Amino acid sequence: MIAAQSAAFYSNQKLSILVIDRNQEPTVGKKTINGWICGDAVGKNTVDYMTERIKISWGNPEIEHPVKGVMAFSPDRETSIPFDGDGFMLNRQQLPRRQLSDSKKMGVNVQFSVALRSLMYENGAVVGVEGTNLLSNEPFKKTAKIVIDATGVTSMLRNGLSINSKIERKIDRDDLESTGRHIMKFEHGIDDKIDFDPDYCIIHLDQDIAPGGYGWVFPKGQDKVNIGLGVQQKELQKRNQRLGKNDDVTKLINDYVKINKAMKNPRLSDDPSDSVNVTGNWQVSVRRQNDCLVANGYMLVGDS
């Protein structure tokens, strides 16, 4: 939606812009059946940049909680590295609804319930997209002067790009982390800023807890967190073999919650603003940015 809003703003709303979403309107931007399983931490400078450039400002309820930075802890938890910088914890269920509202006010059109499968080509250029209308099961085709791909790291459009381009189409499996998280409420247990700090996003580096990745405890209030972890699959296999276990990501997350001494009686959030987004797993890219982001008639944004 940010790409659409930017295009609308800089064209003075003179471009015809269409956003295509596979979801129905009430769940715009939803990643999986479980919710918007993606990052909800953002730097204040990024939000300020957006406000300055395209005159969009976020507030409550899409911004849920302010933070002062990130604190990363070593495996023995004796050493910490601070990364100071104001930021926000976003409510990923509410944010897309705000973005949709802002986009419509800027003249952006939205087509819901369409799953895109491939790009359309003509004379060596991308000229549109095609897929399926999920409500009618009929073919969907739409031409465009430029296609902006925001379908994520597993993009079928990028993977199937068939014109001459410097864009890397396939992503190495080792550059993807299997991740998951719960949004939880809790009572306060032991006052330990290593396990929970309402002012800082906490990262735990530990190859037993999160092999090839890290665990996180991100505050979403005084008694609410986004808690989860990410792992590299081959490192998880090595860890399981070393420890004689057969744990998966979900088991690791649940064990991670159990060892958190600052959280007493943790349970999934019952806030209406989290109603379809309290838990879930997803694949996250941890690689560098694609060296080339454009082809003739085609552009990548975000994780794509």
Predicted features along the sequence, with ranges:
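Flavin-dependent oxidoreductases
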Residues: 181-216, 266-270, 285-286
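N-terminal Rossmann-like FAD-binding beta1-loop-alpha1 element of flavoenzymes
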Residues: 1-19
